[in-house]
Design a protein with these regions (language model features):
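Symmetry-related core transmembrane helices of the 12-TM Major Facilitator Superfamily/SLC fold
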Residues: 1-3, 191
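Juxtamembrane intracellular "pre-TM" segments in multi-pass secondary transporters
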Residues: 6-40
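Transmembrane helices with small-residue packing motifs
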Residues: 3-5, 55-56
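C-terminal transmembrane bundle of multi-pass solute transporters/carriers
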Residues: 23, 30, 44, 56-191
Length: 191
């Protein structure tokens, strides 16, 4: 790491308000259809598909009958899958197009989440949540890499700010929207 030379000087314009910077990010995103699709995709995915993260304690207790250490291991299975999914994008899937990986990971994520959402078997829940985590981070890594490779240095920070709002900012909003639905019809149908 000590031999790496990087230019950390600020890029873009300085002295702009945060709203102006957000506006510049939106303008840059709209200028490239791929960038716009990536931002919309991660936003919709985060809003609608990551509700299960907030519901894992409920699923563990009510559907699987586990708590304590078993719940910790369940969440660790998700995290381990996510870590392997991210690493796999730079290793064994590095030659596969990010577009194919994004599309494929959404289907794998949906199937694994469906299994996780309906199962009452811990033997099925652990591998399902592991695969869910892996597919989730294959998608996030593929989309993030695509985004960063397509935007220029002078607007990358502004566009990545939009990415963070879509990726991390909409997950709790999705949880708030899903909460009353889960109370009304149950966790499995919502997932």
């Amino acid at each position: 790491m000590a031999t790496v030379h990087a230019d950390f000087s600020p890029k873009g314009h300085s002295g702009e308000s945060p709203w102006q910077q957000i506006k510049e990010g939106v303008v840059a995103a709209k200028a490239d259809p791929v960038v716009l699709r990536v931002l919309v995709m991660i936003s919709v995915f985060s809003l609608c598909s990551l509700v299960f993260i907030y519901q894992m304690p409920l699923i563990a207790e009510e559907r699987l009958g586990i708590d304590g250490l078993a719940y910790t291991l369940l969440f660790a299975a998700f995290a381990f899958g996510a870590a392997l999914g991210a690493i796999s994008m730079g290793t064994m899937f590095s030659e596969v197009s990010r577009s194919r990986m994004s599309t494929g990971s959404i289907y794998v994520f949906a199937a694994a989440l469906a299994v996780f959402g309906v199962t009452t078997s811990t033997w099925l829940a652990f591998p399902a949540v592991f695969v869910t985590g892996g597919a989730y981070f294959v998608l996030v890594t593929a989309l993030s890499t695509t985004l960063q490779m397509r935007v220029s240095d002078d607007v990358r920070g502004r566009v990545m700010g939009l990415w963070m709002m879509g990726w991390a900012g909409l997950v709790p909003v999705g949880g708030l929207i899903a909460g009353p639905l889960i109370d009304a019809i149950g966790v499995a149908p919502v997932l």
